[in-house]
Amino acid sequence: KTPVFGMMERSEIENSKGEMEFMSYVHAMVVGNTKKDSLMPIISQFVEEGATVFTDELNAYNALGSMGYNHKVCDHGQLQFVVDGEVYTNNIEGFWSHFRRMITGCYHDVSDEHLQSYIDEAVYRWNTRKASQSERFSDMFNKSIGLIVTWSELKLCKVA
């Protein structure tokens, strides 16, 4: 099984009606393994020091507190899924559930060498889920101008 790592930013934003609305953004990627030495540099790259980080009980996350993060844990092994009403990992688990259904329902199976591309598609769909189809199309079109990806470049996307 190829390890995949994901992080989700949870925040509240003011919508067009002036109401506060929950929003979440995902970063996800194929990783070589789920050990501390692999995950901590990724977390440091995307998460500001001092931020509150909610995780499950994976040992690789134990160093987060000493790295300057406010680390809170849900220990699923102890059937702990919500702590103090705000510490939970349900949102990222919801993203993974959508990703698995996308693979099963649309693609049926994916190879390791193209897994990151499928993850990128799922992340894009999640992060733009509140946009209209025309806004999504326009955004994708604008981002693809000048972008040329050859088959041999795709074949280079191998898992480490």
Regions flagged by a language model, labelled:
Residues 1-160:
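Residue-level recognition of single "structural anchor" positions
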